[in-house]
Structure formats: structure tokens, C-alpha cells
Amino acid sequence: MPRWITLALLCTALQAGAFDLQGHRGARGLAPENTLPGFERALAVGVTTLETDIAISADGVLLLSHDPALNPDITRGPDGQFLTGRGPVIWHSPYAELRRYDVGRLKPGTRYAAQFPAQQPQDGARLPKLEELFALVRQPGREGVRLALEIKVTPTAPDETQAPEPFARALVDAVRAAGLQQRTTILSFDWRALQAVQAIAPEIGTVYLTIQQRSFDNIGAGKPGGSAWTAGFPHAEYGSVPKMIHAAGGRVWSSFHGDLDVAKVKEAQALGLTVLAWTVNDPAQIARMLDLGVDGIVSDRPDLVRDELQRRGLPWPPARPR
């Protein structure tokens, strides 16, 4: 497809308010991930959606954390020192204990810290409850902000999290209690969780996460019997990821950006799927995703996505500072 046609289609989508700029874990490249200061930073930049990860503590508290156990690269204990190894498993720990840890700073000298040189520390930041994020987006002027909530479960370590179905139920109940069904999507790499959400809460959108890389592959193309991640929708039967998601009743595909090309984007959109690309932080890759015609970008640096949209003369979400 000629580039001018791709840009024209993208411009039309943006003008219709369809393009989705998501702040990944808040704005991980600018502020500590999955913290209230991080979400405030994303809102100050201007995003359509706040993306975050959901975990459940031993006493049933829904909280925000990407990892099943506290990550030593971002976590300091009550003594103020960084953890020297993997921290407590969240599913095995009460929330009051988890709240004692400080997650407001990257551990110097780590490879993880090297990925985010622009991140500004926020000492004293704690693992927030999901209800605190709900309160943030209910504030005046933030009524249009959406939430993308990832259910963090895995078939490869089932003892470290709540099981997919009860996890989905707990999250759905919380979203409904907050009255945020129309502003929320629920996403997961483990499609069992998404099937559960679709069965119990058809009013809440689901997002099918995928990656097909050597380091992690939840699709398992060519794997006998299919992947444990895809809830009985094997690649061998459907022939492509968009067709798998369509068969599963999905409406949104969120793919690792390195797996996407124009043919896959066009195939998915022809099936009626919305296509998101994650996690896109490099300016050249941001430009490439826009050229492919994706419907949204998930980024640790939403400011850089905003800059590229501005450079192209396209609209971007408004800033919503406190």
C-alpha cells in the first residue's frame, strides 16, 4: 500500500478519535512503573489509555504489579536497601506486608535500569491498589481516560497466581463495582482468562496479547496440540493469529511490535479486529507502526509517540495534569 494511502487512513482514524495511545505501566520510561506517580506522569503527557498489570494478594486485594514476585531491580525493603534476589510472591503475601516495600526507584547498575535512563525516581512509591487507580481516573477532567488491565497469569507457573477463571471474576467484579465497564478493557497473554471474561462480562472488552519471539512465544505455531496459552485455539487449525483471535471471539489484537507487518495488520483489520502494537519506545519503530496503520500504540514513552503524531500533523490525546 502506498505510504500516502496508509497515512490518509491513519489520519481519518485519528480524527475520528479512534487512535489509542496507551501509557505502558503508566509511563515506565519517565516514572516508576505501575505507581500512582507513574500514572500521573502519563496523564500529564496525554494518553488515551493507562495500561497496567493486575495481581492479587494472599488476602484478595487487587493491586498493580507486572511480576508475580517483587522485582529486585525496582524494589527496596523496609530497611531502604534493594532486594538482593527475587522478592515475595504476591499471591502468597498479604497486602499489608507488600505495602511496606518501596518501588519508586530503579536499582543502579542493572540492565533493567539501563533501559530507562530518563526515568525520574519517586522515592516512597508503593504498590497501589486497583481502587486507587480507579479514583485517579474519576477525577474531574479525566472522565475520558480509559484503562487497560492485564490479568497476570501463566499456565507455566500456576501456583504463583490466582487461577484464570476466579482471577477474571474478581477483576470483573471490581470493574463493575466501580462502574467503569465502558472505560475498561481486560487483556492477557493467557487466553483462558479472556475466555472467562467474555463469558461472565460481555460488556467489558477483551484484548488478546501475543508474542512470537525466541524468548517468549504464546502462539506456538507448528507446536503439536497447540499452545497452552491460547485456550484451545491452535494456530495449526486457524493458520494465522488474527484468525485465532477472531475465532476466540476477540475484537482487539495487541501484538509485540516486532511481529507485525502490513499484511498482518491488513488481515486483522479485514476481520474487524483493532490492532495495537506493544511496547514501542524507539522513534523509528513508532514511525514504522504508524506507517503500518495500527490502531494504537502501547509505549513506555508516550511523549515520543505524541511527538511523532505532532510531527505528522495528526491529533493526539490532551494532557490531563493534576
Task: Identify the residue ranges that each predicted region occupies.
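Sec-dependent N-terminal signal peptides
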Residues: 4-12
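Phosphate-group recognition and catalysis centered on beta-loop-alpha active-site segments
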Residues: 14-322
